[in-house]
Amino acid sequence: MYAVIKTGGKQYKVQEGDTLRVEKLEGTENGEIEFNDVLMFSDGENVTLGQPAIEDAIVKGHILEQGKGKKVLIFKFKRRKGYRNLRGHRQQYTAVKIDSILV
């Protein structure tokens, strides 16, 4: 049994017991979280598609961690002009463990 959920502008295929990193969500560690945008659900035999989402379908989980990803360096350079610019960015994420899929 699996479902496809939408959060943070991205889609994720999830099953019960899965751990995934999504874009930062509000909440504390060990806090409960629900995803209401369930786009697809499959129980192994039947597939249910939403238009765009399945009504009354909820994926429940809890937050494992709030953190930051690896640093990405952005380096701009123009030759012969003495222009150099170095910036860094660390994207925030939320690690979520999926507990149940309810349809």
From Swiss-Prot:
Part of the 50S ribosomal subunit. Contacts protein L20. The gene is rplU. It comes from the Bacteria. It comes from Desulforapulum autotrophicum (strain ATCC 43914 / DSM 3382 / VKM B-1955 / HRM2). This protein binds to 23S rRNA in the presence of protein L20. Disulfide bonds: none annotated. SUPFAM superfamilies: L21p-like. GO terms for biological process: translation. Belongs to the bacterial ribosomal protein bL21 family. PANTHER family: 50S RIBOSOMAL PROTEIN L21, LARGE RIBOSOMAL SUBUNIT PROTEIN BL21M. Pfam families: Ribosomal_L21p. The lineage of its organism: Bacteria, Pseudomonadati, Thermodesulfobacteriota, Desulfobacteria, Desulfobacterales. GO terms for cellular component: cytoplasm; ribonucleoprotein complex; ribosome. This is Large ribosomal subunit protein bL21. PROSITE patterns: RIBOSOMAL_L21. Keywords: Ribonucleoprotein, Ribosomal protein, RNA-binding, rRNA-binding.
